[in-house]
Amino acid sequence: MEIEKTNRMNALFEFYAALLTDKQMNYIELYYADDYSLAEIAEEFGVSRQAVYDNIKRTEKILEDYEMKLHMYSDYIVRSQIFDQILERYPKDNFLQEQIEILTSIDNRE
């Protein structure tokens, strides 16, 4: 499994997990976050390896579709880059730093 895809799926899962079914959440979390194999997940849930594979592939597509429509992850990345640039350019502006900390905490709350 390639690391870029794993990182992206984990990030998309963080943003859109609440929109998934319990089964989708469990399979994706076990596969990407906990690094379970398809066989291990299948054994855990008493289903075939193919059923797990199909569910994970469908859920990956669902997560990508949510991102295409809602842009929550890509917007988060852009905001983070802008905040970093502002902090780098104005390192002594305490007010600006405080405001960025507030905005960052809003982005990072669960």
Curated annotation (Swiss-Prot):
InterPro entries: RNA_pol_sigma_r3/r4-like, UPF0122, UPF0122_fam_protein, WH-like_DNA-bd_sf. It comes from the Bacteria. Pfam families: UPF0122. Might take part in the signal recognition particle (SRP) pathway. This is inferred from the conservation of its genetic proximity to ftsY/ffh. May be a regulatory protein. Belongs to the UPF0122 family. PANTHER family: UPF0122 PROTEIN CBO2450/CLC_2298, UPF0122 PROTEIN YLXM. This is UPF0122 protein SPD_1143. It comes from Streptococcus pneumoniae serotype 2 (strain D39 / NCTC 7466).
